[in-house]
Amino acid sequence: MSLSLSDIKFPESWELIPNERNYIDYVYKESVELGVWRPDNKRDLIAHNNVVSLSKFFWPNMDFERLVMGGELMVWFFTFDDALDAGIYNDEQQAQVVKRMSDVFMNGTVEDDASGPEKMALHLRNKCEVMCGERKDTFNRFISSCIQWVDSIIPFNKIKIDGASPDIELYSYLRKINIGAFPCVTLTEVMLDHEIDHYVWYDPRWIKMNEDIAIITTLINDLVSYEKEVNDNAGDLNPLFFIQKQRKVPLTESFKEVVGLINHWVKDFTNLEESFMKSHKFKNSKQKRDFECMLEHLHYLASGSKLWSMQTPRYCSPTSPFIEMRKQSSSPNLTNSISIPTNNTNNSNNITSSPNKKQKIDITSSSAIFTTREIIN
């Protein structure tokens, strides 16, 4: 049986050529110095290269400095989320870990025993604050979107009731926040020295376009991760899998339904985009171009997710149901778990200035290690 991702139809204007990859090594060195990855660890390096390569698809036209910021966001996303998914924390500990990370963005501080992901979050937050300058509203939108994403992780992980998969509508509603698209969009706003009027961000069409792209990106991710999640006994939160179970249909029918949903949201997005561009009165050509850059980023989140998925060892497999992804991974056979120390490394040449410190809060002894699972097979 062969399924094809070509059934997903994007407008030609959404096509992209990925950016350069020279930023990946730079972000790796940063991540080691911040204690996110272990130095000279091959598995961590492979994991890093996989997840950080997303940035060149999401920001294909940005310069090196901004690509690095996108890479830092990807490192933070994957390591923090996978730590909460790893099963090493009970409910109370998870809530404390989430509160600590929210405080990093809220207050711009870390604890004395800050984890690698917490230090990466502060590092990126500080960069964004400097880049925003007087654009306080832009900075606030970025940190608010990051806090919103952090707060979404535990509720999404508890979406199953009595072990049953959710309905696709409930799944999509929660996942559009949990997928992490909104921090990518607000980071793009940080990257642009724009002249867009503040009220644009509260236009319901702009908000809905963001939600549409988040759902599209979610469903693409669910398609390409299907084989991996089923093999890892994690298919109950994958629509391609749970639609089969709920409706007692074969994989081909489930795939057809998911693709239909993607194409529906693409059409809804393009209608909203056309409506906005026809009705909005831009003050000058720069303001219009700035907004077009924001729209392009939304396009690239969807099309970039698809392109990245067709080449990453994270999902590609000779036995994938998708013909575009049937590639022999060149990565070594790794275990499903990668232990990542979160304390400071022995490298004394830290890339950041000393962050503001708060009084240490003891979560548990297990907080010394984040276990990042399933970054790569």
Swiss-Prot record:
A motif (NDxxSxxxD/E motif) lies at residues 221-229. The keyword Lyase applies. Residues 326-359 are annotated as: Disordered. GO terms for molecular function: (2S,3R,6S,9S)-(-)-protoillud-7-ene synthase activity; metal ion binding; terpene synthase activity. Keywords: Lyase, Metal-binding. One of its GO terms (biological process) is terpene biosynthetic process. The keyword Glycosyltransferase does not apply. It holds the Pfam family Terpene_syn_C_2. Residues 335-356 have a biased composition (Low complexity). It catalyses: (2E,6E)-farnesyl diphosphate = (2S,3R,6S,9S)-(-)-protoillud-7-ene + diphosphate. A motif (DDxx(x)D/E motif) lies at residues 81-86. Its EC number is 4.2.3.160. InterPro entries: Isoprenoid_synthase_dom_sf, Terpene_cyclase-like_2. Contains several highly conserved motifs that are important for catalytic activity including the aspartate-rich 'DDxx(x)D/E' motif and the 'NDxxSxxxD/E' motif, both of which are involved in complexing metal ions to coordinate the binding of the isoprenyl diphosphate substrate in the active site. Terpene synthase that converts its substrate farnesyl diphosphate (FPP) into the sesquiterpene protoillud-7-ene. This is Terpene synthase 1. It comes from Dictyostelium purpureum.
